[in-house]
């Protein structure tokens, strides 16, 4: 039986948990699996580092089967969960001034072309890969992400505690935004949307270096927003919130949407976020000036029974997207393609 290596460049806590689950599941099926992390490769030049990592991975491969979470040109199965490089370029009109962007595009193309199978986390990314790289549809499988579902939800007590902690009005609904990349996930658009929303408590959570700029923007527009850094445990914010808005410019699939749904938040995002594929049309923001969405949000803020009804529906919806289901689907694709 062929040995499997799971490759990752930048190991985060979230990725590490997924990698361990995948490794253990493959071990239980009789595969010998190791996790290779290349974050310890040192280089002052990020371009040199990226090239060096890919060369080293290729040299080490021999007869191993590579499952890659990052872009490696020696990938057998590529888990394309971070979006498409050529799409990110469109968000930055000066992308050509960043040499690393060019190298990443080259490696991405090789990764896509050389891999046996690609697993995307949304049909948005699937369509983009098929279009940009002229990939045959049967080479790509879409598997939506999964989350650990909450064991209990007590929105009332969670809201009371958070409002007391932040010194905000308990009687007002909470509208939440969560991201560590404010530009990509639309913090600007979120703040602008708030200017059309009836009175509510607005909270932005995230570790973004540009936070002071967004604070100033909110102040200039006369919008009261509470900014908080990303906490170790964020679930209590989802549990306390009524509405979650993520007007992404581009995101392959924000798991924040799943987490918010699981705690009964009413969620809105754009069609440029793969997570929109699991939402009904009325919850998809079509443009930055989408009056239908702002009117709907204002309706929700004034109709508590409607809000409770949709909240219950969203909790039920989230139960379709568990880490167990996600892992089982990925294992099935691996088993069908390993040689």
Located regions from the model:
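Conserved acidic donor-binding segment of nucleotide-sugar-dependent glycosyltransferases
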Residues: 282-291, 299-304
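Short hydrophobic beta-strand element within catalytic cores of glycosyltransferases
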Residues: 265-269
């Amino acid at each position: 039986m062929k040995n499997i290596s799971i490759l990752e460049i930048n190991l985060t806590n979230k990725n590490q948990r997924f990698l361990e689950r995948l490794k253990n599941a493959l071990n239980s099926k009789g595969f010998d699996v190791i996790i290779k992390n290349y974050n310890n490769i040192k280089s002052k030049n990020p371009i040199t580092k990226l090239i060096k990592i890919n060369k080293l991975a290729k040299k080490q491969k021999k007869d191993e089967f590579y499952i890659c979470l990052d872009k490696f040109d020696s990938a057998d199965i590529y888990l394309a969960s971070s979006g498409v490089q050529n799409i990110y370029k469109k968000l930055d009109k000066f992308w050509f001034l960043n040499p690393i962007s060019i190298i990443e595009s080259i490696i991405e193309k090789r990764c896509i072309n050389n891999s046996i199978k690609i697993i995307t986390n949304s049909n948005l990314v699937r369509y983009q890969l098929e279009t940009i790289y002229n990939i045959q549809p049967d080479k790509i499988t879409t598997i939506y992400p999964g989350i650990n579902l909450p064991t209990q939800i007590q929105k009332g007590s969670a809201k009371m505690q958070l409002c007391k902690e932040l010194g905000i009005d308990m009687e007002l609904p909470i509208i939440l935004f969560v991201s560590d990349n404010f530009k990509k996930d639309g913090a600007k658009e979120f703040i602008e949307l708030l200017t059309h929303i009836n009175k509510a408590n607005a909270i932005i959570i995230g570790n973004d270096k540009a936070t002071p700029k967004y604070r100033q923007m909110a102040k200039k527009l006369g919008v009261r927003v509470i900014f908080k850094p990303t906490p170790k445990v964020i679930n209590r914010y989802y549990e306390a919130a009524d509405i979650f808005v993520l007007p992404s410019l581009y995101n392959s699939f924000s798991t924040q949407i799943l987490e918010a749904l699981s705690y009964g938040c009413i969620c809105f995002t754009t069609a440029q976020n793969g997570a929109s594929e699991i939402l009904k049309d009325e919850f998809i923001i079509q443009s930055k000036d989408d009056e239908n969405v702002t009117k709907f949000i204002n309706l929700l803020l004034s109709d508590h029974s409607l809000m409770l009804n949709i909240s219950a529906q969203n909790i039920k919806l989230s139960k379709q997207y568990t880490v167990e289901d996600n892992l089982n689907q990925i294992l099935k694709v691996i088993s069908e393609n390993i040689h």
